[in-house]
Amino acid sequence: MVFEEFNNFDEAFSALLSKLDFKINEPFNDVKKVLCIEPHPDDCAIGLGGTIKKLTDSGIDVVYLLLTDGSMGTTDGEVSGHELALRRLEEEKRSAEILGVKKIHALDFGDTELPYTREVRKEIVTVIRKERPGIVLMPDPWLPYEGHPDHRHAGFLGIEAVSFAGLPNFNRSDLIAGLDPHSIQAVGFYYTHKPNYFVDISDVMEVKLRAVRTHESQFPEDVWELWEPYLRTIALYYGKMSGHRYAEGIRFVPGIFLHICPFAHVI
C-alpha cells in the first residue's frame, strides 16, 4: 500500500486504520488480559461492570488497578478515613468476585488527593509491565463537567503510563527487577460522552447493579434510591445510542493516536 497515492484524508485514514493490529469494531479480539484503572474502589463496577462480567465470562482475564484508598467517600463524621478505606477495600474484593475479577492492585493514594506526578505514573507503568495487558481501560479525562480531580488525573496518568510503558529507559528499575517494557495495542475510556464502541449489557444489568450495591458504604438505602435509577438511566442512554436496552459505552483509541494526532477524535 503506497500512501503517496492517496489524495484525501478519508482514503488515507481508512487505509491507516487497516494497517493497525487493533480493530475498533472488535477491540477485545485476541485479547487475553485487560487492565482496568479506577480512581476509587467502585469505579470499575459503576463504569464497566457489565462489560467486565461479559469479558470474564468469555475467558478474558480482567485485573483492577485501584489508585486511591476511597477514604473520603462518606458523609458520616463518625467514621475515620482509615476505617473507611479498610472497609471499602473489602467491599471492592466482594464486588470484583461477582464480576469474575480475581486480582486487584491497590496503590493506596489518598482519596481526593491523587497526585498528578511522575511517581504515580511510574507506579502505573510498573503494574502494566507486570500484568502485560492487551488493552488498558480508564476514565475519560475529557468528560465534560467531571468535577472530581481523581477521575481526571486517573485518565491522564493512565494515558501517559501506557505511552511510556514500552520505553526501556523510563523507570529503569523495572528492568533490574526483571520487568520488560510492554507496549499496549489501545486504550479504552469509560465514563465517556463520545463512545465509539458499545457493549450490550441487557442480560447482565442486574449483575452489574448487584456488584455496585456491594459497595455498601457508598450506597445505603437512601442513596441507592437515587443511584439505582441514575445507573439505569446511564445504561439506557448508551443503549439508545447503540440500539440496545442497556449498554455501556467505551471510547477506544489506538496507541499510536495518543501522540501528536489531530484526528484522534474522528475515530
Curated annotation (Swiss-Prot):
GO terms for biological process: chitin catabolic process; polysaccharide catabolic process. Coiled coil: none annotated. Its main location: cytoplasm. Optimum temperature is 75 degrees Celsius. Activity levels at 37 and 100 degrees Celsius are 20% of that observed at the optimal temperature. It is found in: Cytoplasm. Induction: By diacetylchitobiose (GlcNAc2). It holds the Pfam family PIG-L. Keywords: Carbohydrate metabolism, Chitin degradation, Cytoplasm, Hydrolase, Polysaccharide degradation. SUPFAM superfamilies: LmbE-like. Optimum pH is 8.5. Its EC number is 3.5.1.136. Gene3D superfamilies: LmbE-like (3.40.50.10320). GO terms for cellular component: cytoplasm. It is an enzyme of class 3 (hydrolase). It catalyses: N,N'-diacetylchitobiose + H2O = beta-D-glucosaminyl-(1->4)-N-acetyl-D-glucosamine + acetate. It comes from the Archaea. GO terms for molecular function: diacetylchitobiose deacetylase activity; hydrolase activity, acting on carbon-nitrogen (but not peptide) bonds, in linear amides. Belongs to the PIGL family. Deacylates the non-reducing end of diacetylchitobiose (GlcNAc2). Can also use N-acetylglucosamine (GlcNAc) and N-acetylchitotriose (GlcNAc3). Probably involved in chitin degradation. Homohexamer. This is Diacetylchitobiose deacetylase. It comes from Thermococcus kodakarensis (strain ATCC BAA-918 / JCM 12380 / KOD1).
